[in-house]
Amino acid sequence: TMADRRKALSGAHTDHLLEGTARALMHLNGWSAEQSLAFVEACEQQGMTTKAFYRELQAPLKGERLLVDKTPWYIVDVDILKRVERDFVDPLYIHLVRHPLGMVRSYEESSMQRLLPIATQEGSFGSRELAELTWLLAQQNVREIAKDVPPGRWLQVRYEDLVVQPEAVLRRMCDFLGIAYEDAMVNPYDDMDRRMTDGVATASRMSGDLKFHLHNAINPDAADRWKRFYSEDVLGRETREMAATLGY
């Protein structure tokens, strides 16, 4: 339920994530922050399910636009991923993959180990190991659910291809989604106020890519930047084997 969601995300490092739903309502309905937050609170108090709340998000779209949910943490819980298939009619999946050490480097730069779900358990893993474990768990979960999704509703995209050949990859994604390609798609850092990368208030913490506002253009060098910091020898055997199945 929405109340369960609030309980799960209430915490020093995660409470800002609660604003995502309100921010979406602001964008979809043209509501103020106060209106959106009040609506979410009412949904929580009514015991509304998350499935029903998604229906509230889809209603303003009127079948003319697509509802996109880009929540990376879903991928570490296979039960959440299975609910996507159960709660939606023929959902489309874009599986964005990246070399494990590219992901590790990004997570370490953002100190994302503070937010990693598996990092809440006591252990002696460092930030690099936690990031690698998260990457491996994510790919294992994806493999588990992908076998039950028809190929026509699943598209795998390599991060490295996306930053090196953005237009070609984006055109393929558009064909998959059944939407028209637009030149503005290769300039994601333009019109940032329309990207829903902010919170409901000026002082809100960002709930998406923590480094988004540090960039002004797609940088192809990001594809292999990790090679300056790591050798593939640091990866565990299972991680290397999984990476090989993804073409790395």
What is each stretch, according to the model?
Residues 5-12, 35-42, 91-100, 124-131, ...:
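Short, mixed-charge, low-aromatic patches
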Residues 6, 10, 18, 32, ...:
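General structural signal for secondary-structure boundaries
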Residues 1-74, 78, 86-87, 114-122, ...:
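PAPS-dependent sulfation machinery
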Residues 44, 108-112, 116, 139, ...:
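PAPS-dependent sulfotransferases, especially Golgi type II membrane carbohydrate sulfotransferases
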